[in-house]
Amino acid sequence: PSNGEQQSPQDCGAPPEEQDPESDLSEAQDEERQVEQALDDALEELEEEEEQYQRLRQEELLFQIKDEVEGMLTAHREQMEALVEADSGREQGGRVSRRTRITLRAIAREEEAVAARATKVADALEAEGVLVFHEIVRTVEGDLVRIVRDLGETGGYQSGARVQAMQQDVENALTWLQEALEEEMQRREEEQQEQEQEDQQQQDQQQQDQEEALVPDAAELRLLRKLEEDLLGRVQRLQDLHPELEDPEAELDPLLLEELTRMAYQHQRIGELFQQFRQRLGVPDPD
């Protein structure tokens, strides 16, 4: 270039203006906060989705169990009616006719199928840690196994009051279970509606703990109390029907002894369940 031309600083190779380090740090911190906020939002969304999934899974499981219990109850009631009819046609004190044996075997097969369904329901409840509901279904399963035995050759083709009473116990237990499941599903539905109306986003820890369980402790304890009251009533009725139980030297019928053993085991299990709830809830043992 000629001597008369002037060069700009850039043309002369002058260094560019330096940026403020504090400004760079501030921008980096802002970006970091934005990233952290985005991660927190994503995590919160995932937690909400997980809670929603668990709630829907439990509702579906409750519905399936309730549906299965209703099916068991319907099938069992049909066999109760069939047994009453079969027993009414028997000759008292006589040999069991071939026709009656065939009928009792058919009833036994159906009751055995109900017992198999009870096994699956009990396994599902046990996996969810539902103590009392699981115990009820296990008891139903055991009673049905005894009924099947008594209806067959091993049990002497029984069809009278004792077997029918055991069938009644099964019906009562399944009915209580059905009602308790309906109440729990209704409670969940009402709770969900209240949350939607209030636009409630968070629950305190106690509510969260309760929602994690398929059935809350309060519902289980109510059913456990009902079991205890029913057992006490059955024991009293058995004592009224068999005054010989008051005589320590009386020779008791083997079937009566089996019934007493059955009731004693149920009483033991109820006590053990109450103990488990005391430990779970941190309630001290009674003096």
At which residue positions do the language-model features occur?
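Mature extracytoplasmic or organellar-lumen-exposed domains after removal of signal/transit peptides
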Residues: 1-287
